[in-house]
Amino acid sequence: MEVKAIHRGARISAQKTRLVADQIRGLSIERALNVLTFSPKKAAGIVKKVVESAIANAEHNEGADIDELKVKSIYIDKATSLKRFTARAKGRGNRIEKQTCHITVTLGN
């Protein structure tokens, strides 16, 4: 049995989020939530919400026992960038790209 949760367009770069995702890949649910709770990174809070959503999906849709679940796979994909401009000297402007990503978590036995 596999249960999936996806968060699309998370307002953080894929590179920063992958650092957190690599820490919890393959861990049990309880251990993964502990790692995410005590991580100081912004991405940890976002990934934790996606993992909790996957747990809720497992309980509600599949009726699964959450004590047996593990983080089977977690992957982070780059999403579209938000283009912004910032003012520079002498009436010029520079483009800023604010990165976004898609977070996909799969839980299984």
From Swiss-Prot:
Domain of life: Bacteria
Disulfide cysteine pairs (residue numbers): none
GO CC entries: cytosolic large ribosomal subunit
Kinase found in the keyword field: no
Single GO biological process annotation from the record: translation
CDD domains: Ribosomal_L22
GO molecular function: rRNA binding; structural constituent of ribosome
Keywords: Ribonucleoprotein, Ribosomal protein, RNA-binding, rRNA-binding
Keyword flag Endoplasmic reticulum: no
Protein role: This protein binds specifically to 23S rRNA; its binding is stimulated by other ribosomal proteins, e.g. L4, L17, and L20. It is important during the early stages of 50S assembly. It makes multiple contacts with different domains of the 23S rRNA in the assembled 50S subunit and ribosome. The globular domain of the protein is located near the polypeptide exit tunnel on the outside of the subunit, while an extended beta-hairpin is found that lines the wall of the exit tunnel in the center of the 70S ribosome.
PANTHER family: CHLOROPLAST 50S RIBOSOMAL PROTEIN L22-RELATED, LARGE RIBOSOMAL SUBUNIT PROTEIN UL22M
Subunit relationships: Part of the 50S ribosomal subunit.
HAMAP family with a match to the protein in the record: Ribosomal_uL22_B
Name by which UniProt lists this protein: Large ribosomal subunit protein uL22
UniProt organism field: Ralstonia pickettii (strain 12J)
Lineage: Bacteria, Pseudomonadati, Pseudomonadota, Betaproteobacteria, Burkholderiales
Protein encoded by which gene: rplV
